A protein has these predicted regions:
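Flexible, glycine/charged-enriched surface loops at secondary-structure junctions
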Residues: 28, 53-60, 85-88, 230-235, ...
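Long amphipathic N-terminal alpha/beta scaffold segment
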Residues: 56-106, 112-113
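Conserved PLP-enzyme active-site core in the AAT-like
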Residues: 83, 131-366, 401, 483
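Structural motif of enzymes handling amino- and sulfur-group chemistry
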Residues: 335, 343-344, 351-402, 412-415, ...
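Conserved C-terminal alpha-helix-loop-beta "cap" of PLP-dependent enzymes
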Residues: 386, 390-473
Length: 485
């Protein structure tokens, strides 16, 4: 058959759309979606035919031109375009707060509250008892004050946003004093100095990368009176223009650590210095640990204890050790939080009803530390004991062997980690199932698992594929095993 004959054999779009399968599909997905898919399939066939050489045209599969064949291809095309880019995966890496996998899984009550709140209208900015307009800032502020001991609180969309609005409200046009050892990059090339520049505040670095004393902060303080006599050409070899000091700031080293010959000013020392000079103290905590977890090897500062040192403002993430949704949470003295709520950035950085729904349900768990430990997945994973993990590893190994008799499983000891820019030096002793799938290499097996209906994201160490059970929920064991079929 010649190329022109093949082109004449292309079916008409309307004829293909009359196929019963596409009529039903159009009712579900819409006429436009299905018509566009048919048009795309026919256009592809036309292009394929035009690319043929005359002498090879007779080799073209004419069955592809049938209406039912085009309809089938259109169905595949619609299904492919309907596939979501954001979907569930199983975390078998042993990294609890895996940034690439969405950080903290939500607790069941948070999930239910999001579903309930998002199904219809909500009390986002309406005071139901009083029958008048309300403020979203009030939704979780009382709960945060109760849990942290703060005078007031507000929520923005992430901790970088919290840093931005805190510095803009408290430090614009003034200097913020920070230790050189705490000028962190928080991920994605976003750095504290860059955020400070955007806020309009001026960075004053003190100390060195490994040692910063409280006297370094005090020596850097610039008052209005001092500015009157300040001459950058005489006082500073760099001839740097100076501004009045607006605040002292401490940034928790949550995604790295400095060991060896080190020294840093404590929150207590900074709070005392701030009171002495009438300067507020800001603590960018980052990780959001609400309760003491030292019993489980996590010796990180917690929020209530940090605020109790006398600092003025504290900010942290919602989706790290707090175990909630992505959010930037700011707690502290009422005068500073009130200024942030009125700041123009507050509207640009505000969060939606689903974030508040998840956050409120998560925070409620912290009214009883035992309940938080039981119900919040992040805390539960951190606190999992070795006996529980060993037993889960044995069940997973048995399930994988049952799914595929060619797979060789071995239970091995591993070191899990917190991840997500939290507690970088902490290693949690755990267990994993080391898997050898027939003659496949670890890399090939890892790719196979990623192609499963629910992709399994595993860990490779020393050319061994490891399924770390700390981050695999009990109800996910069957799905992991099915990925080996």
């Amino acid at each position: 058959m010649q190329k022109q004959e093949l082109l004449r054999g292309l079916p008409k779009i309307d004829d293909v759309l009359r196929q019963e399968s596409l009529v039903m599909l159009a009712e579900e997905k819409g006429d436009i979606v299905v018509t566009d898919a048919v048009r795309e399939v026919i256009a592809g066939l036309r292009a394929d035919i035009l690319d043929l050489l005359e002498e090879t045209a007779e080799l073209f599969d004419e069955s592809l031109l049938r209406e039912e064949s085009v309809a089938a291809k259109a169905e595949e095309l619609v299904a492919g375009k309907e596939k979501k880019r954001l979907f569930p995966v199983i975390n078998a890496t042993g990294t609890i707060l895996h940034t690439n996998l969405g950080r903290a899984p939500l607790c069941e009550d948070a999930i239910k509250n999001v579903e309930l709140t998002s199904r219809g209208y909500s009390s986002l900015e309406y005071n139901v008892p009083q029958g008048k307009r309300g403020s979203r800032h009030d939704l979780v502020s009382d709960l945060l004050k109760e849990l942290t001991g703060a005078e007031d609180a507000m929520v923005v969309n992430n901790n970088a946003s919290a840093t931005l609005i805190v510095l803009a409200a408290m430090g614009k046009g003034r200097e913020i004093i920070v230790s050189r050892g705490e000028l962190v990059e928080i991920g994605g090339a976003f750095r504290i100095p860059d955020i400070m520049k955007q806020s309009g505040a001026y960075l004053t670095e003190v100390g060195t990368s490994n040692k910063t004393k409280i006297s370094d902060y005090e020596d850097a303080i610039m008052t209005k009176e001092m500015l009157e006599d300040y001459d950058p050409w005489e006082s500073d070899p760099r001839h740097t223009e100076r501004f009045e000091t607006g605040a002292l700031m401490k940034v928790h080293k949550s995604n790295y650590d400095i060991v060896g010959f080190t020294e840093e000013a404590s929150l207590e020392e900074l709070a005392e210095l701030g009171k002495k000079h009438g300067l507020p103290v800001i603590f960018d905590m980052g990780n959001g640990l609400m309760q003491d977890m030292s019993e489980y090897g996590l010796n990180e500062p917690n929020i209530p204890a940090s605020l109790a040192t006398g600092i003025d403002v504290m900010l942290f993430s919602g989706d790290k050790l707090l175990g909630g949704p992505q959010a930037g949470i700011i707690v502290g003295k009422k005068e500073y939080i009130r200024a942030m709520k009125k700041h123009p950035l507050a509207r640009a950085l505000r969060v939606d009803k689903m974030t508040f729904a998840a956050l409120e349900a998560t925070l409620m768990k912290y009214r009883d530390p035992k309940i938080a430990l039981r119900d919040i997945p992040v805390l539960r994973m951190i606190a999992s004991d070795e006996e529980t993990l060993r037993e889960r590893a044995e069940r997973l190994a048995d399930a994988v062997r049952s799914a595929n008799s060619e797979v060789v499983c071995e239970i091995v000891e591993v070191e899990d980690q917190i991840g997500g820019g939290s507690a970088p030096t902490v290693r949690l002793p755990g267990y994993a199932v080391s898997v050898q799938d027939g003659n496949r290499s670890a890399d090939r097996t890892e790719k196979k698992l990623r192609k499963a209906e629910v992709p399994v994201i595993a860990r490779i160490n020393d050319d061994r594929l490891l399924l770390c059970v700390r981050t695999i929920a009990d109800d996910e064991i069957k799905q992991v095993a099915e990925a080996f079929r």
